[in-house]
């Protein structure tokens, strides 16, 4: 009887929750317009219904979201990804072209339709096409829930970013070029916050603010602090944490921090809100680049605005690895599936610099990977059908997955996993090449003890020449991207694909393609069945698939050996010739030159007469040359 009453109570609660859930419908059309975001240069930006910036979305847990996204740009495809949302049962809504959907062609409309059942906190959305979010196609996505454990009076969101004066498409042409063989990333012109510079935040005294801080940039990590104010971290990447007080945050692109800031009682003074480039990520620092950006926390509008606030060190920022989740989840046990990848940046045979996981640079297939899953039947668990250059791994249902990432590069990289918040169980220190240190890969037999209750998040950075280890449970069937969130590196191919429980995807009604999906694919002429090469007859035949450029051959090719042989032979002959002529009497040498080269003696004599005086005047120290000319005249 008790169990029956409990079941009825749970059912009634579920029905009540459904009744309270709302549906939020948005009709958005992309376009182009000019904006002067940083006050220095007007440039094209991607607009939403003719407006800029794009709107933030705020919903409650359990709500349904419907976004009709129409591509109003006539010169490019587009898409939309909801960063950090798990998309349980709706992997086709994850918004990654050629992974979970077809690109949205000019004039086409795609419906993103999903329920936010498993996420709360701070997220964001952005285009997942050709770096478009650096041109402004992005906004925050906030999911509220009554169960949030901390009290506050008011809240504010801050979107941090770098800003370029040029379009990403123009920057990409010079970045992905033989004239940029080292892969040096384009340098931004400024740091901005909430799509402007010198933001003013008016505050009330003795008030607790919930501050949502999101780095929506595509390249540079930022240091963030507020002059003479502490920040209490209470959430990262949608995961509520135990309180942790800090003076400074280090925020990579795509990461989110939610903090509590309590204001002072005294209103006589205003304070600086500071952003600073992580300038170690810049290959060069232009002389006119301002590494700091200052906004204003204003208590008193009649008081002077603050100047820049300088700190003694930027090394004392919060290390997110040691944060404790509010709802503790014990570390997963020994993994069932270990994926080890090495990060390398290198050039291919076309002379362009690319990024690699284990010597594979991600190259999009001809059929979106999710559609290959849905159309491949009992071969869906064969990773080969997804393409040679998609770097696809098959994950079985509910297995514990460990990703070991070894960074062979000298830069910092923030990595994002779609569809999951992972446990962060290891992150090693920086190994500085300037000090002669070499890349250090994870050693499973020699590492610090793993945390009992690891921090969870969806975006984690790896330090230079270092490593990290993450774990998650494969309990969310779908096709999920794991990639560097530096947009330049994603354009270079730094990504891999996880096909999680492929047969579970096939069996779920909610995972099937909608008519709208198929219409979008038809509009851009992308196949919706078959393997990575769009072959529907033999899924193991990848003839015609998209592949990366060839590697530069190691050592010498046959042509190189032949060229080197003839070069050496020519060089040896040259040395012998110089030696022979050098040992001969000058008069005999002159005779030999005339005889061997079939020179007309009178022509040579005329040349000697005309140039003798000029040669002597230009080089009085060339005694041997003067003697040669004199002997030549005597000879004739």
From Swiss-Prot:
Q: Please report the stretch or stretches of sequence annotated as the Plastocyanin-like domain.
A: 32-146, 157-301, 362-502
Catalyzes what?
A: 4 Cu(+) + O2 + 4 H(+) = 4 Cu(2+) + 2 H2O
A Pfam family matched by this chain, by name? Cu-oxidase_2
Q: Which residues bind Cu cation 3?
A: 128, 418, 483
Has the keyword Cell cycle been applied to this entry? no
The residues on the Extracellular side of the membrane are 22-559
The induction text for this entry reads: By iron deprivation. Repressed by iron excess.
Record-listed Cu cation 4 binding positions: 413, 484, 489
Sugar-bearing residues? 27, 74, 77, 88, 113, 194, 198, 244, 265, 292, 300, 359, 381
Q: How does it sit in the membrane?
A: Single-pass type I membrane protein
Which GO terms fall under molecular function for this chain's record?
copper ion binding; ferroxidase activity; oxidoreductase activity, acting on metal ions, oxygen as acceptor
Main role? Answer: Iron transport multicopper ferroxidase required for Fe(2+) ion high affinity uptake. Required to oxidize Fe(2+) to Fe(3+), which is then transported into the cell via the ferric iron permease FTR1. Essential component of copper-dependent iron transport. Also has cuprous oxidase activity.
Protein name, as recorded: Iron transport multicopper oxidase FET3
UniProt gene name: FET3
């Amino acid at each position: 009887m008790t169990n029956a009453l409990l079941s009825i109570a749970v059912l009634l609660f579920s029905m009540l929750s459904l009744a309270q859930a709302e549906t939020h419908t948005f009709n958005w059309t992309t376009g182009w317009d000019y904006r002067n975001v940083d006050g220095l240069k007007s440039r094209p930006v991607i607009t939403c219904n003719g407006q800029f910036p794009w709107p933030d979305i705020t919903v409650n847990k359990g709500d349904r979201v419907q976004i009709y996204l129409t591509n109003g740009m006539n010169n490019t495809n587009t898409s939309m990804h909801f960063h950090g949302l798990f998309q349980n049962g709706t992997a086709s809504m994850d918004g990654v072209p050629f992974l979970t959907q077809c690109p949205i062609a000019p004039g086409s409309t795609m419906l993103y339709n999903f329920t936010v059942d498993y996420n709360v906190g701070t997220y964001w959305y952005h285009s997942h096409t050709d770096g478009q979010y650096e041109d402004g196609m992005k906004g925050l996505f906030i999911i509220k829930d009554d169960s949030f454990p901390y009290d506050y009076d008011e809240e504010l969101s801050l979107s941090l970013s770098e800003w370029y004066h040029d379009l990403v498409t123009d920057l990409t042409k010079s970045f992905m070029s033989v004239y940029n063989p080292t892969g040096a990333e384009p340098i931004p012109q400024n740091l901005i916050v909430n799509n402007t510079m010198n933001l003013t935040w008016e505050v009330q005294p003795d008030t607790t603010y919930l501050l949502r801080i999101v780095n929506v940039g595509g390249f540079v990590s930022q240091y963030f602090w507020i002059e003479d104010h502490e920040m209490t971290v209470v959430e990262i990447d949608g995961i509520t944490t135990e309180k942790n007080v800090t003076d400074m945050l280090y925020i990579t692109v795509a990461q989110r921090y939610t903090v509590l800031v309590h204001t002072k009682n005294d209103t006589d003074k205003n304070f600086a809100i500071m952003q600073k480039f992580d300038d170690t990520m810049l290959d060069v620092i232009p002389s006119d680049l301002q590494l700091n950006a200052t906004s204003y926390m204003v208590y008193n509008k009649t008081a002077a605005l603050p100047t820049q606030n300088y700190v003694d060190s930027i090394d004392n920022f919060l290390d997110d690895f040691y944060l404790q989740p509010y709802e503790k989840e014990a570390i997963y046990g020994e993994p069932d599936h270990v994926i080890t990848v090495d990060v390398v940046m290198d050039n291919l045979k076309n002379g362009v610099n690319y990024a690699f996981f284990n010597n594979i640079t991600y190259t999009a297939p001809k059929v979106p990977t999710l559609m290959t899953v849905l159309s491949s039947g009992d071969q869906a668990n064969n990773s080969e059908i997804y393409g040679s250059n998609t770097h696809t791994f098959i994950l079985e249902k509910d297995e514990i997955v460990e990703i070991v990432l070894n960074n062979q590069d000298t830069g910092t990289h923030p990595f994002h996993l779609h569809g999951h918040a992972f446990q962060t169980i290891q992150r090693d220190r920086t190994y500085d090449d300037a000090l002669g240190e070499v890349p250090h890969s994870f050693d499973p037999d020699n590492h610090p003890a793993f945390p009992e209750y690891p921090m969870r998040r969806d975006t984690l950075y790896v330090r230079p020449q270092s490593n990290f280890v993450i774990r998650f449970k494969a309990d969310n069937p779908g096709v999920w991207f794991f990639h560097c969130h530096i947009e330049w590196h994603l354009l270079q191919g730094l990504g891999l694909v996880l096909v999680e429980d492929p047969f579970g995807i096939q069996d779920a009604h909610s995972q099937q393609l909608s008519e709208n999906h198929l219409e979008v694919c038809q509009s851009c002429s992308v196949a919706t069945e078959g393997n990575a090469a769009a072959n529907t007859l033999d899924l193991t035949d990848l003839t015609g698939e998209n592949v990366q450029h060839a590697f530069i051959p190691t050592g010498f090719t046959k042509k190189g050996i032949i060229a080197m042989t003839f070069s050496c032979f020519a060089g040896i002959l040259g040395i012998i010739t110089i030696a022979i002529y050098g040992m001969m009497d000058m008069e005999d040498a002159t005779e030999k030159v005339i005889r061997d080269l079939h020179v007309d003696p009178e022509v040579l004599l005329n040349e000697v007469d005309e140039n003798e005086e000029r040669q002597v005047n230009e080089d009085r120290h060339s005694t041997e040359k003067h003697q040669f000319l004199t002997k030549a005249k005597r000879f004739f």
